[in-house]
Amino acid sequence: MVSVEGRAMSFQSIIHLSLDSPVHAVCVLGTEICLDLSGCAPQKCQCFTIHGSGRVLIDVANTVISEKEDATIWWPLSDPTYATVKMTSPSPSVDADKVSVTYYGPNEDAPVGTAVLYLTGIEVSLEVDIYRNGQVEMSSDKQAKKKWIWGPSGWGAILLVNCNPADVGQQLEDKKTKKVIFSEEITNLSQMTLNVQGPSCILKKYRLVLHTSKEESKKARVYWPQKDNSSTFELVLGPDQHAYTLALLGNHLKETFYVEAIAFPSAEFSGLISYSVSLVEESQDPSIPETVLYKDTVVFRVAPCVFIPCTQVPLEVYLCRELQLQGFVDTVTKLSEKSNSQVASVYEDPNRLGRWLQDEMAFCYTQAPHKTTSLILDTPQAADLDEFPMKYSLSPGIGYMIQDTEDHKVASMDSIGNLMVSPPVKVQGKEYPLGRVLIGSSFYPSAEGRAMSKTLRDFLYAQQVQAPVELYSDWLMTGHVDEFMCFIPTDDKNEGKKGFLLLLASPSACYKLFREKQKEGYGDALLFDELRADQLLSNGREAKTIDQLLADESLKKQNEYVEKCIHLNRDILKTELGLVEQDIIEIPQLFCLEKLTNIPSDQQPKRSFARPYFPDLLRMIVMGKNLGIPKPFGPQIKGTCCLEEKICCLLEPLGFKCTFINDFDCYLTEVGDICACANIRRVPFAFKWWKMVP
């Protein structure tokens, strides 16, 4: 490059000094210039002194020299000698800083030559919240900004996905380069600051290019606020735009950009996005290409979607508006009041089956140091939906995202309902501070086997922070793991315990209970005695005595099969979650094998599937120590349901309050049980996901 004075200015990383005339160079803050000290040394030179001006740091033989110091170093002339030079701040004018090297012969008092390097320091940097404290700070290590490191001692900036419900189904038009962003939305975006400083006569000869790769530009958007102090922001980087040129007009440029992700990590997207600013010199000769003189890079990681176990404190209960059955809403509302939770109604969605609220949606959250956002992740089973009423039911500040599914059959396992999250666990020395995602699967290849689609499975694995565990659930009609297991919170974590218990469905425990009651003389007590005949008929059930249930060999064989399936999962859970038998409570529950209902004949498999014989006790609403449990309508012993009594005996000594909810009118129908009629938003983990090491 040529300066305004016509002197040759160098951006080279190695500078060769001259005794005949000064050398001029530009040094970008954060970079080093290597000086060849021996190349121009006079013959018979035996030593040299070197010093620099106030903004220059010099390193010779691992000795750092500042303005106040001179270093006299003896060095054989035959050995190449180098010094590294760095600038500590930008220069106020061209050639405002310098390095002088004076050479001496055998007589140290008589210098035999002097070489001078004039320096012009400029700053070109991109800065982000690299230290994850919510503040944009200048990094002392330029190379560190190019990496993203997990763990408590790690570093690297974080991006949040735009989960604004208003943007669901909407795409920013390719040609639309302006967007109004309100002040409350700004807090969701991550800041990226561009700093450029130096003499204007130097800077104006270059241009700055802010850029990313074409692939990464599809995963995030970068906005630049307009100068009119309005809420209008210019889209400078995003889908179909991976580079943006800024003009350098003055001696100081400081601009803040706002960045949002538009996709969570997935099989095709690692979650890492890098942005660079390049200082580009345009050639005066048309035959010579432009030259990139310097590039600074920062790396963001898109915050993962974190799923929340039912052991976390509840905040808000969402209920299907069309399911306001007699007593149901009142009971759930009372439960919510006991746990200081709000109740919200959800708009009816005529395009989706009644189970959609819980089976196809999950409350989760995403988090950066500056912001935590709760959101609904929706995996709609109905294809080609044009509208999503759920997004209009959410409380302010709650996000909404759609994760497409592939299998849209009625009995599909390809939905977020086929997922549960364990509380935090430690397994063989490995900690999972955010718990582990539990996925229902078919476990082995089968012509009729069902499983979560690869797309959804890969999405769950790609989040990295809740290492998935696959369970065998294809034996269930719904295929969902929450039909045979549930976690409840305990207060004993500080006493060396895990802080939770695992409840597992147990047909054998149910048969044991019924045999006990039979021996006590209650064999004629009726299951479903409290229900009307039309209720039983609509659900394919009939009232039976304990004697009849115990004499039903077919039902017994069906439950022996179910017991084997649950036992397989029990072993997996003990291994993968580090559980022991004392962490597990067996809940009496019977199942029966049936064909799928309400599905087209071409989707009907040959085999039968298990479904709860009476309302599933495991499908409870967990609200701290308050449990909303489906009323099982078990045999009445002295006016008390023996199943309810058993549950209370198991759980109430541990401090739980059991409320049994009559939801039989939606049991086994398209609606399902109470868990499918409600979904709960919970408190996010206190632990920050970036402090773990996957």
From Swiss-Prot:
The keyword Nucleus applies. One of its GO terms (cellular component) is cytoplasm. It is found in: Cytoplasm; Cytoplasmic vesicle, Secretory vesicle, Cortical granule; Nucleus. Keywords: Cytoplasm, Cytoplasmic vesicle, Disease variant, Nucleus, Phosphoprotein. Phosphorylation at Ser-10, possibly by RSK-type kinases, and Ser-446 creates binding sites for 14-3-3 proteins. Coiled coil: none annotated. Transmembrane segments: none annotated. One of its GO terms (biological process) is cytoplasm organization. It holds the Pfam family PAD. Changing N598S: In OZEMA16; uncertain significance. Highly expressed in oocytes and weakly expressed in other somatic tissues. The modification Phosphoserine is found at S10, S446. The keyword RNA-binding does not apply. InterPro entries: Cupredoxin, PAD, PAD_C, PAD_central_sf, PAD_N, PAD_N_sf, Prot_Arg_deaminase_cen_dom. GO terms for molecular function: calcium ion binding; identical protein binding; structural constituent of cytoplasmic lattice; tubulin binding. Belongs to the protein arginine deiminase family. It is linked to Oocyte/zygote/embryo maturation arrest 16: A rare cause of female primary infertility. In affected women, ovulation and fertilization proceed normally but embryos are arrested at early stages of development. Inheritance is autosomal recessive. PADI6 variants have been found in a spectrum of phenotypes characterized by aberrant methylation of multiple imprinted loci, a condition known as multi-locus imprinting defect or multi-locus imprinting disturbance (MLID). MLID-related phenotype spectrum ranges from intrauterine death to different types of imprinting disorders, including Beckwith-Wiedemann syndrome (BWS), Silver-Russell syndrome (SRS), and non-specific developmental and behavioral manifestations. Homodimers. Associates with alpha-tubulin. Structural constituent of cytoplasmic lattices, which plays a key role in early embryonic development. Cytoplasmic lattices consist in fibrous structures found in the cytoplasm of oocytes and preimplantation embryos. They are required to store maternal proteins critical for embryonic development, such as ribosomal proteins and proteins that control epigenetic reprogramming of the preimplantation embryo, and prevent their degradation or activation. In contrast to other members of the family, does not show protein-arginine deiminase activity due to its inability to bind Ca(2+). This is Inactive protein-arginine deiminase type-6. It comes from Homo sapiens (Human). The gene is PADI6.
